[in-house]
Amino acid sequence: MKISHIPPRLATGAFILNTGIGKLHPEEDAAKRVHDMAARTYPFVAKADPQAFVKALGAGEIVVGSVLLAPVVPAWLAGAVLTGFSGGLLAMYFNTPEMTKDDGVRPTPKGVPLAKDVWMLGAGLGLFLDGLGDRRRKRQRRKARLYT
């Protein structure tokens, strides 16, 4: 792991892990709010029990946070996981009308909590792209050794 990967992996991993742990024992009204918001963007979620959905979401967040914090996970994979996770959150943001102003991009006060997750998308893409570059450089070095 590169030293430059530690700050984004630590910041996002700890944040997501903590959020996931907090969802393992949700209160009924909080579970319903999270479930309803997710169901507006992802209609198949409406069929799930709110409590079970939020617990499963929490477990998923724990996995994502753990992947980011585990130094043995390559940067490209950690970045791909974070990009997918944050992409799902931003999809909820963009598909929930009361989250954005009339232009569909800038957040309303209700949208700020999800709009801020764009930083995780940036961190995920950065890790992913840097990790892919590392893989390419390793292959090129290996190939160069074979032909010298």
Residue ranges of predicted features:
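Membrane-interface extramembranous regions
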Residues: M1-V63, A70-T148
